[in-house]
């Protein structure tokens, strides 16, 4: 349930504001129920890559990482602990490190909206509406993935259509990537190696 009044969340003095940290702050302001302050810190001395540390000091909590993405993952971890009734005791710190650097989802979605071996309806990507219309589901998708540490996604079927590398489709892909990027998610495409021939009308 969203808070009626925003929680007390701030960045450390040495931490620069970014789109990713804005998301972490917003999530905590909306859903953190703790009475104390939450401090977000990005430090080069912190846990490497996307790892993070959560430290409880009285009523206050500090989330720290070597990266913005790590702080975002820490925010989601803190909210998950709150939901599960597993909050840290005073003076206790917990450190988490992902086992894999790339944690990727691979879609088997086609440009026409069908999904190869798909059993849950049509593709979430509305290629016919992009780039003019951007579904709010894209950000919810990014949010859900970031909350469990997913940091990469392949948008299309491994049996790729050449048109995925057309100028028009790449403009649409760029719009999706722009939505996913602040959530720490990199965008990938499967490619058909005959695309230059198919799109450029090259002879063999």
Give residue spans per PLM region.
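Acidic, contiguous N-terminal accessory segments
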Residues: 1-58, 66, 88-93
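Feature activates predominantly on carbohydrate-active enzymes
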Residues: 27, 46-204
């Amino acid at each position: 349930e969203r808070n009626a009044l925003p929680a007390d969340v701030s960045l450390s003095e040495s931490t620069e504001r970014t789109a990713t940290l804005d998301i972490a702050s917003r999530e905590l302001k909306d859903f953190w129920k703790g009475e104390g302050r939450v401090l977000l810190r990005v430090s080069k001395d912190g846990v490497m890559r996307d790892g993070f540390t959560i430290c409880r000091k009285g009523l206050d909590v500090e989330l720290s990482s070597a990266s913005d993405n790590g702080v975002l993952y820490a925010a989601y971890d803190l909210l998950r602990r709150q939901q599960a009734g597993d909050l840290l005791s005073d003076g206790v710190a917990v450190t988490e490190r992902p086992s894999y650097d790339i944690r990727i989802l691979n879609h088997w979605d086609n440009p026409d909206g069908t999904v190869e071996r798909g059993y849950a309806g049509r593709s979430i990507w509305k290629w016919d509406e992009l780039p003019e219309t951007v579904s709010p589901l894209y950000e919810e998708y990014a949010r859900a993935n970031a909350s469990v540490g997913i940091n990469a996604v392949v948008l299309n079927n491994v049996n790729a259509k050449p048109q995925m590398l057309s100028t028009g489709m790449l403009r649409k892909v760029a719009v999706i990537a722009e939505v996913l990027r602040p959530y720490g998610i990199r965008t990938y495409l499967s490619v058909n190696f005959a695309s230059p021939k198919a799109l450029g009308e090259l002879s063999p």
